[in-house]
Every structure is written in structure tokens, then in C-alpha cells.
């Protein structure tokens, strides 16, 4: 495990890369009560065109955001319900190039971290859950479209870029959402939710040696396939 001293703050950043490729960044601060867990994949709204398993794909816009929504389900119930019972707060967000899953708590560090890794790396995608979430996402997309700030940002990017996917809304349009299929979501998950394409960030009150041991042990239990063979296809901007 590498230690990197941050001169400006007099803190130490710990870094390690597990055998399966998952990168772990840890910044402990024992002056606070809470800890923050963030599991991230380098998959966002711009990653709609790619080559995976020797086949090219052109996915609907907003699919990364759709996948994020579906990730909060396990076979035994809702991820939100599980974390609520142990007093933890969770959230997630999708940007142009990253999807992030977050947990905040002040106790039961091991359980919080283990479950974060478990639910993200063992998806439960069913036709029923996929269909029920579609309406929720459509309403969210409509809400963003009515937001003045989002409208200004999107309008600006729409004028800045010609072909770049950043000119489009992260969640896509209602039409985009309607066009997304369950098999599309599964393909994107298999392609991008790979330890070699992901990184874990832990900050706050925790022990970095303990955190790394828990992460390594849990990833070994989950036995995730880390054969990463995605090649992104980005449209070129005119010079």
C-alpha cells in the first residue's frame, strides 16, 4: 500500500490496487465522526458507443443513468431499506463519464463497505423491476428539463459541441428512456462494471489497513470476472 503525503493539508492518502484491478484510495480523518464510501465506475452518459466482446454497440442516450437506478435492487429487497435499517445514508449519481455509488455512516464500517461492494457487483435485473423503474426515470428526466439551471448548462454545451455526447442530457430524453431495453442495460453492466474499470474512495473516520483488508476479502468472496475488454468509440469534433 502506497502512502502519499499531502503537503498542503498535512494528511496522508493511501493507495492500493487489488489483484482484480480495483483501485482503492483512502484518506482517513479521525477528527470527524463519519466515514464516506464511494464506489465508482468509469461509465457515464458519453459512453454510448463502444466495442465489447468483438461487437460494436450504439446504445440509447441515458442508459448509464438507467443502469444506476436499477442497481439499487437485490433479490431479497431494496438496497435503500437495508441501509436504512442500519442507520446509513446512500445515494448515487451519473455524470458524463462516471457513475458513483455512495454510503455515509458513523458506525458498522465493515457491514457498510461489504454491502456496498456486494450490491454493486451482484446486480439483480428483472423485467418487472426494469419496467417499473422506466416511469420513475421518465418523470425525473422531465423534471430536469424544467430546471432553469440544467437548461442553461445543457444549452451552452449544445452550442459548444457538434458531435460530442456532452451536448446531450446525462439522463437522455423521455424518448431515449422509452427506447432502452433490459438487454442493453445488462450489456453495459457486463462491459463497464468491471473492477479494472472502477475505483473505491474512502474518507473520514476509519482505519485504512482494516478497510483494505475488508475490501480485498469481500472482492475475493464475490469472485468477480475482471476480463476487461471494452474500447470506447468517441465521435470526433470538427477542427
Residue ranges of model-derived segments:
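Charge-rich, well-structured scaffold segments of protease-associated domains
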Residues: 17, 74, 78-230, 234
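His/Glu-rich zincin catalytic helix
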Residues: 1-79, 186-239
Amino acid at each position: 500500500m502506497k502512502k502519499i503525503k499531502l503537503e498542503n493539508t498535512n494528511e496522508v492518502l493511501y493507495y492500493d490496487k487489488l489483484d482484480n484491478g480495483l483501485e482503492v484510495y483512502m484518506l482517513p480523518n479521525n477528527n470527524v465522526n463519519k466515514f464516506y464510501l464511494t464506489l465508482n465506475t468509469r461509465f457515464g452518459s458519453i459512453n454510448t458507443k463502444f466495442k465489447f466482446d468483438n461487437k460494436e454497440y450504439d446504445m440509447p442516450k441515458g442508459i448509464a443513468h438507467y443502469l444506476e437506478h436499477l442497481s439499487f435492487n437485490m433479490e431479497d429487497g431494496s438496497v435503500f431499506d437495508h441501509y436504512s435499517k442500519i442507520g446509513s445514508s446512500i445515494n448515487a449519481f451519473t455524470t458524463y463519464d462516471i457513475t458513483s455509488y455512495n454510503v455515509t455512516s458513523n458506525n458498522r464500517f465493515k457491514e457498510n463497505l461489504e454491502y456496498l461492494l456486494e450490491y454493486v457487483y451482484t446486480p439483480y435485473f428483472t423485467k418487472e423491476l426494469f419496467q417499473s423503474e422506466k416511469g420513475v426515470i421518465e418523470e425525473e428526466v422531465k423534471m430536469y428539463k424544467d430546471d432553469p439551471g440544467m437548461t442553461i448548462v445543457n444549452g451552452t454545451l449544445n452550442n459548444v459541441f457538434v458531435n460530442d455526447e456532452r451536448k446531450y442530457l446525462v439522463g437522455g430524453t423521455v424518448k431515449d428512456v422509452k427506447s432502452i431495453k433490459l438487454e442493453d442495460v445488462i450489456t453495459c453492466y457486463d462491459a463497464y462494471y468491471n473492477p479494472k474499470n472502477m475505483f473505491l474512495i474512502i474518507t473520514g473516520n476509519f482505519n485504512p489497513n482494516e478497510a483494505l483488508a475488508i475490501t480485498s476479502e469481500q472482492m475475493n468472496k464475490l469472485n468477480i470476472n475482471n476480463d476487461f475488454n471494452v474500447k470506447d468509440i468517441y465521435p470526433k469534433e470538427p477542427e
